């Protein structure tokens, strides 16, 4: 068995079935957090501003506005065991793959809703 086949075999078990989402979509990411001996689920809701990579190395970044108007960005590995599930709250139409310009916008961000 070649090394390439061995890597594919190991990676196959790591893949997760998560919903398809795009930059601009509002998502709820359910994250498992371990504190001491306890585990709990924390929900991080925000707008997907970028998706990069492919395969097991695929990541996505979600931005939300926390209390006090401070922007919080968090990058998640797509196939990580820490990510329990992803819920799509709202789908949006964007013309860019990376929505970095959202960082400079103050107040509520209006994105056109995508109909399917």
UniProtKB/Swiss-Prot annotation:
Single GO BP term: translation
Keyword annotations of the record: Ribonucleoprotein, Ribosomal protein
A cellular component annotation (GO) from this entry: cytosolic large ribosomal subunit
Disulfide bridge partners, by residue number: none
Segment forming the signal sequence: none
Superkingdom of the source species: Bacteria
InterPro entries per the UniProt record, alphabetical: Ribosomal_bL19, Ribosomal_bL19_CS, Ribosomal_bL19_sf, Translation_prot_SH3-like_sf
KW Ribosomal protein (keyword) present: yes
PROSITE patterns membership: RIBOSOMAL_L19
Transmembrane segments: none
GO molecular function, one term: structural constituent of ribosome
Database matches in Pfam families: Ribosomal_L19 (PF01245)
The protein's role, per its UniProt record: This protein is located at the 30S-50S ribosomal subunit interface and may play a role in the structure and function of the aminoacyl-tRNA binding site.
Family (UniProt): Belongs to the bacterial ribosomal protein bL19 family.
Identification of the protein by name: Large ribosomal subunit protein bL19
Organism: Pseudothermotoga lettingae (strain ATCC BAA-301 / DSM 14385 / NBRC 107922 / TMO) (Thermotoga lettingae)
Gene: rplS
């Amino acid at each position: 068995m070649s090394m390439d086949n061995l890597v594919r075999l190991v990676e196959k078990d790591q893949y997760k079935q998560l919903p398809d989402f795009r930059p601009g979509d509002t998502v709820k990411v359910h994250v498992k957090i371990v504190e001491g001996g306890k585990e709990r689920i924390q929900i991080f809701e925000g707008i997907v501003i970028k998706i990069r990579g492919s395969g097991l190395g695929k990541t996505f970044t979600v931005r939300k506005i926390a209390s006090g108007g401070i922007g919080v960005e968090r990058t998640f590995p797509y196939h990580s065991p820490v990510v329990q599930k992803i819920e799509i709250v709202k789908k949006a139409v964007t013309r860019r793959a990376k929505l970095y310009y959202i960082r400079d916008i103050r107040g509520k961000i209006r994105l056109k809703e995508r109909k399917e």
